[in-house]
């Protein structure tokens, strides 16, 4: 074979070795084509003087192979470097303390809380306050998305839970999920879900809980949960008090009357206003915030005062809290014949937390068993020390019923208001707070507002949370229609798109476009912080073996504050056998829609200080829907408790009969019998027993049979021995304690 292969410079052919030639002549064979090449165009590929690269075009595969070889070379270099680094890291050098190490030091008990000598230290949680657990919502949301690849077994999780210690106080920044709350409270998610389930709230592990719901869970578990609000929210609320100093004018004081139920708050206000409000109130108790303006003569001048009469009943804590937040002076009413009570203490805490000046009115001094000095002594426990005892708290003994010392009390109020130097700017747009809201048959959604700065006028475009209004009308506390409202004055307005939430701040905008933007922002914020307690839960599938039934409720009230109070009171009913589920609670009259939904869901409709709309009463009778109407919150709560008792059956008081100790365990067929020695009292065959092991009740039930040798006996007395068989329990152990009781049925309340 001739080594000299001739090719054309224009056309190339593919050789047996990896060279690719581009050829135009596709139908001509290689041999024929080579013979047609002119002599001067032939090239000797094996001639060392010829640069064959000028004529050769590399194949694409060749290019890829070259690049692959280059990458392989680079990878080999990198691997070599990594190996050298690993070798350097793996070197172990003994130091002078090496010989003192012991194998036992590196062994630890199983569990996440065990101390591992070489474990990475835990990163401390952010925003910790003293010894309390704190949760920053943003941080937790991020961290909660990281899932561990290894799933902990149920046994290990239980061990972890036992090792954790529940905190006494926890601080949260806002709404959070069930899972996040469980981490903070060091409890299982199941425990939180069960607690809410029994209150009628079905949740999942990732569902968001609002602050009030989280606090309710904390109360059930004996953990105090504090809410630290974001700085942005706080600064927004403080904008109300940012006033142009050059345009300031004196304004009337806002005075909140607070104290325990039946201590005479409304009677005191009646005496000041010279009215008879107390006689008109259902059950003799205030059940909503009453806002009133009063003009009194003082030193040849007419002074205007604004009073807020807050409810004293336990259920209305939310209203009391709102009342003190907008007040300038607080009057704490304490009955001289009754003393300091739970709601008195709660009111003191609200007042002191708001840093509001306080005047104590010791009422009912005309009663025979009145003890003014004892009241003063009780109040010193809460850092309220009278001036004549060396303190700085103003205390005025009065009789609201007879009008004793009323002038002294009013003089003190005016004196304190002058010291406080209360001012506002009437030339700016109005700002203030929503005290209450309800639905009116003719006006629609109406709200009672307290103007705190600026001037409110008919036609103003107002927003309060997600509610918006072009004010169509205003009525003052005397029931008179007015065109404008000045600072420190309460006013009833209508023209609202929907009911605003009580306690919401309101502000005025120049046009509807700006107002709609503000409402849209509030709606977006509400989507994130939406409370699950006010929505119908679809999570009805959670089962609990201890739950004996479900009560579905639809609650309609006169105002939103009453609905809030009723829901809060229902959640505090001490029971864990029945799930009380509030499907929804709202202000307004009962409609046919409410009746239809109650029929579908099997709910009881509770009406509080409201009535049935036209057609609703007929629909309720036709569909056999139970509707209960109340005007006193005590009666409404009593009805719910009685309904719970009907489901759970009779409740019993336990009367101790005797105690015995297990001295031996004997087999009987497929079960076991406990051999007892009675140490106290007696054990009767009909007794209810508890089996106690290491201070824990391992069985609670009744006796199947009681024997002495082989004979049935009715009872075994102290220092005697007997055999005890319980069909439902056979895991006896020596030294178990058997406590016997007689069950005495509790008396039922009458409906």
Curated annotation (Swiss-Prot):
Checking HAMAP family in the record gives: IF_2_B (MF_00100_B)
Renumbered residue ranges of the record's region Disordered? 86-156
Q: Which InterPro entries match?
A: EF-G-like_DII, IF2_II, IF2_N, P-loop_NTPase, Small_GTP-bd, T_Tr_GTP-bd_dom, TF_IF2_bacterial-like, TIF_IF2
Q: Which PANTHER family match?
A: TR-TYPE G DOMAIN-CONTAINING PROTEIN, TRANSLATION INITIATION FACTOR IF-2-RELATED
Cellular localisation? Plastid, Chloroplast
Gene Ontology CC annotation, any one: cytosol
Region of interest called G3, as start-end residue ranges on this chain: 309-312
Q: Can you name this protein?
A: Translation initiation factor IF-2, chloroplastic
Bias regions of kind Basic and acidic residues — which residues? 93-106
Function statement? One of the essential components for the initiation of protein synthesis. Protects formylmethionyl-tRNA from spontaneous hydrolysis and promotes its binding to the 30S ribosomal subunits. Also involved in the hydrolysis of GTP during the formation of the 70S ribosomal complex.
Gene source species? Rhodomonas salina (Cryptomonas salina)
